[in-house]
Regions:
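Short, flexible, solvent-exposed loop/turn segments with mixed acidic/basic and small polar residues
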Residues: 42, 158-164, 194-207
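Short secondary-structure junctions
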Residues: 51-53, 186-203
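Short, charged/polar "capping" segments at the starts of alpha-helices
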Residues: 136-139, 179-181, 222-225
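Residues at beta-strand starts and edge strands
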Residues: 166-168, 208-213, 242
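Short amphipathic alpha-helices in soluble, non-transmembrane regions
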Residues: 182-190, 224-237
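Short, intrinsically disordered low-complexity segments
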Residues: 198-231
Length: 254
């Protein structure tokens, strides 16, 4: 959604017309996250006369390294937070649900890392407020400052689900026949196989004849999995067959 309220599909670039919610029949749309520039503009209107500093790689002036101790509002993208002289008097962490619930394997840990990096910039007596319906497990880890406990729980869950870093996982993308050939070899070698399934759409279109699959191995067999896939891919290249892309331990599985 742009500043004029026009909504465009991120996949096919088509403008969305009169949209209706199938549940409530409503027509209003709201951004899940408005971005640092828009947030800075809205805060400037809400607090006239108060300086607003926006820091981010996409800003015209780029990332602001530090600010002095005079009263001001600072809006920053994750990783671009300026250091404030004496620390910030308050820190608001916005869009907690958007950041901690992304469909990536490491979304929760990345959210905790970014929130922590911002929280440590606060003054000793300052409040840190997390907004936006964050994942409760990640939020509690931040509240209790229990990063080690969070990491232990994550590792236990990953081990139960046979996911990295407790297991090695290879994601295969390519033509159906090529992916199925690699899966057959993986199964013959005793590795776990998931799929194949249709690949995710690109610009609203699913590539015909494409497939995606996962091959999993315990850490003790991780090198064997990588070696097997490397040999098979070199064989396919030598025979000039359609390439299959292999990514080890991807953050996005499907």
């Amino acid at each position: 959604m742009d500043r004029q309220g026009r909504t465009t599909c991120r996949w096919c670039a088509r403008t969305v017309g009169q949209w209706t919610c199938p549940e409530c029949g409503g027509h209003a749309l709201r951004m899940a996250a408005v971005g640092s520039t828009r947030t800075g503009e809205e805060l400037g209107r809400a607090f006239p006369g108060i300086p607003v500093v926006v820091s981010g790689a996409r800003e015209a002036h780029g990332v602001v390294d530090e600010v002095d101790g005079s009263p001001r509002l600072v809006v920053s993208t994750p990783g671009a937070e300026p250091v404030a002289e004496g620390g910030y008097r308050a820190v608001l962490l916005l869009d907690g649900g958007v950041l901690s619930s992304r469909p990536d394997l490491g979304a929760a840990g990345e959210a905790l890392r970014q929130w922590t990096n911002a929280a440590v910039l606060a003054a000793p007596s300052a409040r840190v407020i997390l907004l936006g319906r964050p994942d409760p497990v990640v939020a509690q880890a931040l509240v209790r400052w229990d990063h080690a406990g969070f990491a232990r729980r994550e590792l236990i869950e990953r081990a139960e689900l046979h996911l990295p870093p407790a297991w090695r996982v290879a994601r295969l993308d390519g033509p159906v026949r090529g992916v199925e050939s690699l899966l057959a070899q993986a199964e013959a070698d005793g590795f776990e196989v998931l799929g194949p399934v249709a690949p995710p759409p690109v610009h609203g279109q699913v590539a015909p004849g494409g497939a995606r699959a996962l091959v999993r191995a315990p850490l003790t067999r991780g090198r064997a999995l990588a070696n097997m896939l490397g040999v098979r891919l070199r064989d396919r290249s030598a025979r000039r067959e359609e390439p299959v892309r292999v990514e080890m331990d991807p953050t996005r599985l499907w």
